[in-house]
Amino acid sequence: MYDYPLYRPPSESNSLIIQATLGCSHNKCSFCNMYKSKIFTIKSLEEIKKEIDYFRTIYKYVEKIFLADGDALIIPIGDLKSILEYIKNVFPECTRVTMYGSPKSILLKSIEELEELKKLGLYMIYMGIESGDDEVLLDINKGVSSKELIKATQKVKKSKITLSVTVIAGIGGKEKSINHAINTGKIISEIEPDYLGVLTLMLEKGTDLYNKILNKEFNVLNDKDILDEIKLLIENIDVSNHVIFRCNHASNYISLKGTFPIDKQRLLNEILYYQNTNNLKQEVFRRL
């Protein structure tokens, strides 16, 4: 039924995955090889409905559904509405549907269209921001500027869909670490997402970034540099509304969690503890 590899956010570990698309609509980020083996494809509405029907026959109760692969929001609005309506009919007990959404796929949809998706059960959009620094965004071939990232996230917020964003520590290398941390903190402050996750750069063979490292065109941060960068990122986050923060992904050297703004100082104190004790995850245990 599934076309592997298959990815989903850690928080969707108990969700039924319906693979409405294959691959990623952008698939050009220099650091990512998740979908390099796939040609991006949007499945037909008929095929998606058949898969939904199939899962109904094997699962008696499904509370959460995640639409895969890497950018299900790119599906044309009419088909996406039909998918959500069909899920409601086949899985009436389902309380939330979530998906990845690229900045460009969000920008292609109006606030009114996003509001319609919200009414039909779309609870959360996961979006990779990676960085708030325009030079870094250009370097990693993200395909959007920081202004476009802000515009996309504001549309999600206005539609009342829950927004979960991720950024990547170390993605700017040593040369751009400071600007990456400061400007990423600033963009998070402006966006005020519902959830913020920090991952740490993993070196994936076959990616453009990996080749840059081999050619000594990119200097990788060590574990202590990463802590300094995350600390600087947190120092530059200034929000009024609650932002649930997680830095506990398997790629990270340390585990942090809290809620901005109330836990900001505690998080900084915890980083200081890690810096003083050097009690960091060993490289061999880091993974995506």
Where in the sequence are the language-model features?
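Auxiliary Fe-S-binding modules of radical SAM enzymes
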Residues: 2-12, 186-288
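Canonical Radical SAM [4Fe-4S] cluster-binding loop centered on the CxxxCxxC motif
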Residues: 4-47
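Aromatic/hydrophobic pocket-lining residues that form the small-molecule binding cavity
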Residues: 48, 80, 110, 149, ...
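Conserved strand-turn element in the central/C-terminal portion of the radical SAM core barrel
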Residues: 104, 132-136, 156-180, 199-205, ...
